[in-house]
Amino acid sequence: MNLLGSISTGFPCISLHKKSLRDENPARKRLIDMDPRWNKLRASRSSDYMGCIFEVPLLGFSKVKSSSANGSMQVFCMDYPRPELENTINFLEAAKLSASFRDSIRPKKPLEVVIAGAGLAGLSTAKYLADAGHKPILLEARDVLGGKIAAWKDKDGDFYETGLHIFFGAYPNVQNLFGELGINDRLQWKEHSMIFAMPNKPGEFSRFDFPDVLPAPFNGIWAILRNNEMLTWSEKVKFAIGLLPAMVGGQSYVEAQDSLTVKEWMKRQGVPVRVNDEVFIAMSKALNFINPDELSMQCILIALNRFLQEKHGSKIAFLDGNPPERLCMPIVEHIRSLGGQVELNSRVQKIELNSDRTVKKFVLNNGSVITGDAYVFATPVDILKLLLPEEWKEISCFQRLNKLAGVPVINVHLWFDRKLKNTYDHLLFSRSPLLSVYADMSVTCKEYYDPNRSMLELVFAPADEWISRSDSDIVDATLKELAKLFPNEIAADQSKAKLLKYHVVKTPRSVYKTVPNCEPCRPLQRTPIKGFYLAGDYTKQKYLASMEGAVLSGKLCAQAIVQDYDKLVSTAVGDQSAEMFV
């Protein structure tokens, strides 16, 4: 998971959770799916029924709470109503950009655009090109959608994911995308809080609660001032003074801090060291999976800027199930409904060029080739660098890519034999030297819901020294850290809660490593090569390495292609049709 994310007037949603999609009893699942009461609950989840109690007769479920005499039960979850995001400036700007594709003049000859990579950047590019009346041909190397939000199902029917993905209110393009697809109800919004473990008090947590009655930035200031467990008043004052130049100088000041690490900036601004220990280490690991002595301060300031400027910016939501099915497939269905193509198991092996150094075709690993009017690389930057043609390597924008490299990260999933009590229906900052953030997904996510057993999903970072270690070593180290977070429930030797199974997902090159002086190296979506474009969170956009950054990069890439329509249809490349040749 990477981030850019109480006194709330929203009441907790008190609703019946559907049995996980991995229910071993297909007949029971069909019974639930056919029952009209479930359809009613699903249809109303994010509307009039928020904050109400549903009583539904038991349909073969295990009891989670004590049932009443009439055979009904109540299951409590902490989902909150969707926050009011639609009137924020950033949301409206994102909505305007989305509308520009739908409202654009229909092309006489739709462009056939070949896109490599079906992560969020590639899916976004294809979606908005299709909205503009063009035909995207999206190629995914693997057999699963999503790229860095991919997930897989094991033999037991349980999903395990590439990362712990959190959706913030400060993600305007992502929030617009959910609305455009009609899937806003798939986001499970949580209480507006940030919750940190207390390393010096094993098993205890400290909270920053954002009051709903105050506008930004006062709700954030209130949350910080009310928390007296992590920083003293003196430290808070010095921290605030250190941040004053960012508040006064705005975006130009933020961009100028790209040359400094977080620690260097703190020293320059006279910010106490304990602010690093109590706040910035956790933020740095959540934002970019690295520590403050490596992370560019620009990254921290951008996140703080979003959280302090937008009332609901730091409010978080979990997706209600696995990302490939619950988010990526609706995008694919939208693309296909407008005439686009999406192909799995289609790995680009080579970018073959014309004599003028423009792209002639993509050669796939099975020997087939595909041609089009324009080409997009929406893969991680490390894959682009591997496949970059020799003829392009002396071009300055491609040379600068050498500064950009993906950061390693590990995602750990642990299934226990019991329900853990010392957790929340929320994202938790572990403040562990080995772990970043974690969540009990059996509580926070509907599809993974389990009334009897906990499933912890944890981000193991920084991972440089662990990426080559065995899965068992990583799990053993994780359990030792969890014994500090759950001292009464988890022991490293499993003498308490028993580990039923685990999955470890290693990503040697994840989002680009946001170290100092990276900003000038990030390329625009439109390259100097006519008809060749880039998408990905490493490309130039204001949300850095995040899901929001990936989606926005795809929109900007699609915008560049639409703007270049006349140039593209007039070239020889435009005379070729996009089709597969074996």
Curated annotation (Swiss-Prot):
The prosthetic group or cofactor this protein requires is: FAD
Which residues are recorded as binding substrate?
A: 306, 545
Q: What keywords would UniProt list here?
A: Carotenoid biosynthesis, Chloroplast, Chromoplast, Membrane, Oxidoreductase, Plastid, Transit peptide
Q: Which residues form a coiled coil?
A: none
- The protein's predominant localisation is plastid
Q: Where, by tissue, is this protein expressed?
A: Expressed in flower buds and lips. Lower expression in leaves and roots.
Q: Which GO terms describe its molecular function?
A: FAD binding; phytoene dehydrogenase activity
Q: Which reaction does it catalyse?
A: 2 a plastoquinone + 15-cis-phytoene = 9,9',15-tri-cis-zeta-carotene + 2 a plastoquinol
- What is the recorded membrane topology of this protein? Peripheral membrane protein
Q: What class of enzyme is it?
A: oxidoreductase
One GO cellular component assignment for this chain's record is: chloroplast thylakoid
Once renumbered to this chain, the transit peptide range reads 1-93
Question: Which Enzyme Commission number(s) are on file for it?
Answer: 1.3.5.5
Q: Mind listing the GO biological process terms from this record?
A: carotene biosynthetic process; carotenoid biosynthetic process; protein homotetramerization
* Nuclease listed as a keyword: no
Its quaternary structure? Homotetramer.
Q: Which family does it belong to?
A: Belongs to the carotenoid/retinoid oxidoreductase family.
Q: What is this protein's record name?
A: 15-cis-phytoene desaturase, chloroplastic/chromoplastic
Q: Which organism is it from?
A: Oncidium hybrid cultivar
The taxonomic lineage of its organism, from the top, reads: Eukaryota, Viridiplantae, Streptophyta, Embryophyta, Tracheophyta
Q: Which gene encodes it?
A: PDS
